[in-house]
A protein has these predicted regions:
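N-terminal accessory interaction module
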Residues: 1-52
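SF2 helicase/translocase NTPase motor core
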Residues: 16-24, 30-31, 45, 55-83, ...
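The Walker A (P-loop) glycine that initiates the GxxxxGKT/S ATP-binding motif of P-loop NTPases
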Residues: 95
Length: 193
């Protein structure tokens, strides 16, 4: 898949019909030796549709539109991970330990928040990394976002969740004691770490 002028995705495929019939902003350019070239508008909707068709290596518009926030410049594999995460409603990230998965997730969530697709993120993780990994990394990579760690008594956790931080980290054991608050908390993105 090739990006042309930051506007168009050029796809080479043996069967252009599924793309042309499902993606309105697409056009068949040519067919030669059984391979068709299809031009597709490079928007989030179109990229998600291509990803849903299992097209390989679909780039998300995050690569073009996002100003990578924070104190560190992302590596290409972090950009690729964030791109992948923005294209799928549900996704697993099995990158190796120490490759910057947390930063990639933060950037993907921040981008979706800037697009108005996500308003609050619930992070389920072990107690040992709620602060050291999530709160600290949120400050490092998206210091403009609010983050709270929901820990303590049930009353304290409920108060923290109701306070409205954009990112809330809670440990797995803490879920049961504030289930109602979480269900009613307006979380539209959930990260399980």
């Amino acid at each position: 898949m090739q990006i042309i002028d930051d506007k168009v995705l050029l796809v080479r495929t043996p069967d252009p019909k599924p793309i042309i019939s499902q993606i309105k902003k697409s056009a068949l350019l040519e067919t030669h030796n059984g391979v068709s070239k299809v031009a597709i508008h490079w928007g989030m909707k179109e990229a998600r549709m291509l990803a849903a068709m299992n097209a390989p290596n679909v780039p998300s518009p995050i690569l073009r539109d996002y100003a990578w926030t924070g104190r560190l410049t992302p590596f290409e594999h972090q950009k690729s991970t964030a791109s992948f995460l923005t294209l799928h409603d549900k996704a697993f990230c099995f990158n190796e330990q120490g490759t910057g998965k947390t930063a990639s997730v933060i950037w993907a969530a921040d981008y979706l928040m800037k697009r108005g697709e996500v308003s609050r993120v619930l992070i389920l993780c072990p107690l040992s990394i709620m602060d050291s990994a999530w709160r600290q990394d949120l400050f490092k990579f998206a210091m403009h976002r609010s983050c709270s760690v929901a820990h303590g008594t049930a009353k304290q956790r409920a108060k923290i969740i109701k306070a409205g931080s954009e990112f809330v980290a809670i440990n797995f054991d803490g879920l049961a004691v504030v289930e109602e608050e979480i269900v009613n908390g307006g979380f539209d993105l959930i990260v399980v770490d």
